[in-house]
UniProtKB/Swiss-Prot annotation:
UniProt KW ATP-binding keyword: no
Protein name: Large ribosomal subunit protein uL23
GO BP, one annotated term: translation
InterPro entries xref list: Nucleotide-bd_a/b_plait_sf (IPR012677), Ribosomal_uL23-like (IPR013025), Ribosomal_uL23/eL15/eS24_sf (IPR012678), Ribosomal_uL23_CS (IPR001014)
Function according to Swiss-Prot or TrEMBL: One of the early assembly proteins it binds 23S rRNA. One of the proteins that surrounds the polypeptide exit tunnel on the outside of the ribosome. Forms the main docking site for trigger factor binding to the ribosome.
Keywords (A to Z) from UniProt: Ribonucleoprotein, Ribosomal protein, RNA-binding, rRNA-binding
Highest taxon in the source lineage: Bacteria
Length: 100
């Protein structure tokens, strides 16, 4: 897989209360990923970009919400979320550098 595709697969870490609890309890990191990305691409991207070993990947497509602004009705885009479980002894911390 090309370096360009690796960078396009992972869009951002998804930070939420549920994601934080998963990270602490089951060593699972949550990412926003490209809609067309598959589990193999997500695994390769995480392993190569962050130099950690991935145990499993679960994905879900989050449906966009319908929003109104006055009489106009629109819809937000669908997006894909990936739950990446790291192997025992592996860790990935996004908040550590921000504390300084």
């Amino acid at each position: 897989m090309s370096q360009e595709r690796l960078l396009k697969v992972l869009k951002a870490p998804h930070i939420s209360e549920k994601a934080t609890n998963n990270a602490e309890k089951s060593n699972t990191i949550v990412f926003k990923v490209a809609l067309d990305a598959n589990k193999v691409e997500i695994t390769n991207a995480v392993e190569q970009l962050f130099e950690v070993k991935v145990d499993s990947v679960r994905t879900v497509v989050v449906k966009g919400k319908t929003k109104r602004r006055g009489a106009k009705i629109g819809r937000r885009s669908d997006w894909k979320k990936a739950y990446v479980t790291l192997q025992e002894g592996q860790s990935l911390d996004f908040v550590e550098g921000a504390a300084e």
